[in-house]
Amino acid sequence: MARREKREPIAYILGRKEFWSLDFEVGPGVLVPRPDTETLIEEAIRLVPDRSAPLRIADLGAGSGAILIAALKEFSHATGIGFEASPQAYDYASRNAARLIGARAEIRLAEW
């Protein structure tokens, strides 16, 4: 209760947040994925209806990796790269990518 009284996000307290039916690790140093951001994935599906298209997806400012990883889950033959300048967010994105999508996602600590 003390952490909530200090207005710490519930996702930080739990250490996780669901996004696009996937369970992402989150905490201080990374933005919590928001449900309204899922509209980006919906729009990608609308624009590219062939979910087996061999896409290469880039995510600039990857944060937790939620957008890139969700897109890769939907596009089964796609690969992607996420760039993140924050070392803390990079760590979260790297762990989430390794656990949820494997070698199809590469996360780089870099300014873009």
Regions found by a protein language model. Give the residues of each.
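Conserved AdoMet
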Residues: 1-47
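Conserved SAM/SAH cofactor-binding pocket of Class I
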Residues: 39-112
